Amino acid sequence: MISDTVIAILAVALVGSTVQAAPVDATATSTSGIIAVPISKSAAQLAREADPVVSLDWLKKTKAQAQYKHKQANARLHSKRATGASVLTDQGSESLWTGPITIGGQSFTVDWDTGSSDLWVPSSACSSAACNAHHKYTLTSTGKKQSGTFSISYGDGSSASGPVYKDNVVASGLQATSQVFGAVTSESSSFSSDPSDGISGLGWPALAQLSGTSYFWSLINQGTVTSPVFSFRLATTNSELYLGGINSAHYTGAITYTPVTQKAYWTIALGGVSVNGAAINPSVSSAIIDTGTTLVYGPTAGVAALYAKIPGSASMADTYGSDYQGYYTFPCSAVPTVALTFGGSSFSVPTSAFNLGTVSSGSKQCVGGIVGQGDGSWLVGDVFLQGVYSIYDVGNARVGFAKTV
């Protein structure tokens, strides 16, 4: 694939709103300042495109991260009971969609993640190799240290921790005043190669480990965004997070909305799953929509039923061992059309996203991007989201999908 410099549009409009405001289309804010910003793909993604063989180590790592991320957040959840578009960079095998923010006037790149609800970046007090590889936060005149500490762990054994601060956070001109965030002083060495400096969560407040609201919820509460809605276009080029509305330039046709069933993750009802037009039993009829997860994970039984409909498919565990339980291969010459149904509308997984690459050099078997894991909700990540324009409506507690362009 040819490497391009990507041009994305940032539209900024600082207009007061209430939580009940209706979603605002980007075309309604054409009087706002518009800035064209060039971004490029990461080295990791370019390397992956040049090599069609999927990394077996990456398969293990990405599954472990997805599994542990939601297990940890669920434990925390149970213990509790104007517009602006931010340009995103596809970080490919790093499993991240990153974009720029400033904290106290200092620039950072963060992973925008609908599957978590906290904001954290490295602190200048951190001297580890991982921290030194990234931008670090220094306390400013607008910042203030808070009581308590922040700590998070990941499925591959890595972790990050540090004190809590408040400072002004800005993305695409939209400022959240006195935003709470973690400033990491201890960070595992495995973070050294991460393309982002930290994470900005877009999940509901119930998921948060930090006390206080997340960045986008602060924008709503402070009357900064036009509408309590954000939306994503995720693609190999021109990816965008649109804060405070919907960008009609990135979708076509009608938007199908599905109500959120639990205000923690963006969890909605899954209406069905099909393979090459044939319906299968999904086993579980709920789905978590998560931009911070690369693949699509489903209940073991549901995913087994899916691949049973694909001639020539095989479980990777039979050949490569239990570390690859839940992964399947299929003939590269016949990439299936898999579709998920939400709100009565069917949306296909892009075949280019479903096909993760050949299982080994010269093999005619490719690895599928839908993986069996456990018996809980479907976890719908970027393999599906690259085929839709996704809308997250806080005010009406619903998720919308439309055909992306």
Swiss-Prot record:
InterPro entries, A to Z: Aspartic_peptidase_A1, Aspartic_peptidase_AS, Pepsin-like_dom, PEPTIDASE_A1, Peptidase_aspartic_dom_sf
Temperature dependence: Optimum temperature is approximately 40 degrees Celsius.
GO biological process: proteolysis
Superkingdom to which the source organism belongs: Eukaryota
GO MF annotation: an example: aspartic-type endopeptidase activity
UniProt KW keywords: Aspartyl protease, Cleavage on pair of basic residues, Disulfide bond, Hydrolase, Protease, Secreted, Signal, Zymogen
Compartment(s): Secreted
Disulfide bond annotation, renumbered to this chain: C126-C131, C332-C366
Main location: secreted
Residue span, Peptidase A1 domain: 97-402
EC number annotated for this UniProt entry: 3.4.23.-
Broad class of enzyme this protein falls into: hydrolase
Family per similarity comment: Belongs to the peptidase A1 family.
Functional description taken from the UniProt entry: Possesses acidic protease activity. Hydrolyzes casein and azoalbumin in vitro.
Protein name as catalogued: Aspartic protease
UniProt source species: Phaffia rhodozyma
